[in-house]
Structures are given as structure tokens and as C-alpha cells.
Amino acid sequence: MLFFGFLLAFLSAVPGTEGEIIPRCELVKILREHGFEGFEGTTIADWICLVQHESDYNTEAYNNNGPSRDYGIFQINSKYWCNDGKTSGAVDGCHISCSELMTNDLEDDIKCAKKIARDAHGLTPWYGWKNHCEGRDLSSYVKGC
């Protein structure tokens, strides 16, 4: 019985791998408050579509692409934008540790995502957006919010 108590205490102390799933309309509100509507010619619907297809609204989303990795709700890449200490030749364009992009505090994620969009003049760096959102009617992503 003591073993199970120890195991339960240990598992409670280990951070979850699922992260916080931010409800769609809550994220719409956050992005509006941070000036995403019209930013670099994008709409809130573009960003919501991007997030759905990149991370499914999960703040701790992680994707290993082999030579680099994607982190957080916007799936920001370690080759160009953040430092994970593992990616050879990383640029660290946002001057941030990739682990900071996997918290429930979205401030750093938002700053970096806006820098990426500003540098690219849009959302083309994100394959989730290019493959699922670009040129489509995205009104359903903000409907009811």
C-alpha cells in the first residue's frame, strides 16, 4: 500500500504531457486582445485554423521533425525561431528557449508567432495553415465567438 501511495505522489508531481487545451472561443478572444486581426494581412480565423491544425489548441504540443522540433500552441520550430539545445545550426530568431513555448502563458508564444508572421509577411511558414487554411472559407473557425 505504501508503494501505491508513493507512486500516486510521484505521478502527481510529474507535469502532464497534454498541456492546457485552450477553448477555441477563448483563444479567439486572446488573439483579438493581442492585435492579430489584420496583422500582416491575416484574420483571427486564419490564426485559429492554423492553431487547430498545428497543435489542436494544446499549449504543450510537441512534434519531432527529425533535425528540428516544433513547440507549443503555434508549433514554433527550433531550427529558426527558438533554442532547444538540440537543433544543429539553430538561428533562435525569437531569442527564446523552446521550453518557454510549452507553458500555459501565451505571451512569449504570441510575440514569437507575430515575429514569424511579420518576417514572412503572412502565415506561409506554417504547413498546417498552408495545407488546411490558405484560400479557404474560414468563417466557421470564429463563428459563435
UniProtKB/Swiss-Prot annotation:
An example of a Gene Ontology cellular component annotation for this protein is: extracellular region
GO biological process terms, alphabetically, are:
defense response to bacterium; killing of cells of another organism
Instruction: State the active site.
Output: 54, 70
Q: Has keyword Disulfide bond?
A: yes
* Record keywords, A-Z: Antimicrobial, Bacteriolytic enzyme, Disulfide bond, Glycosidase, Hydrolase, Secreted, Signal
Q: Which SMART domains does the UniProt record give?
A: LYZ1
The EC number(s) given in the record are 3.2.1.17
Q: Give start-end of the signal peptide.
A: 1-19
One GO molecular function term of this record is: lysozyme activity
Disulfide bond entries: 25-145, 49-133, 82-98, 94-112
What top-level class of enzyme does the UniProt entry assign? hydrolase
In this entry, which stretches build a coiled coil?
none
Catalyzes what?
Hydrolysis of (1->4)-beta-linkages between N-acetylmuramic acid and N-acetyl-D-glucosamine residues in a peptidoglycan and between N-acetyl-D-glucosamine residues in chitodextrins
All copies of domain C-type lysozyme, residue ranges: 20-145
Pfam families linked to this entry: Lys (PF00062)
Compartments annotated for it: namely:
Secreted
* Major subcellular site: secreted
Q: What does the record note on quaternary structure?
A: Monomer.
Note, other: Lysozyme C is capable of both hydrolysis and transglycosylation; it also shows a slight esterase activity. It acts rapidly on both peptide-substituted and unsubstituted peptidoglycan, and slowly on chitin oligosaccharides.
Family (UniProt): Belongs to the glycosyl hydrolase 22 family.
Functional note = Lysozymes have primarily a bacteriolytic function; those in tissues and body fluids are associated with the monocyte-macrophage system and enhance the activity of immunoagents.
Q: What is this protein called?
A: Lysozyme C
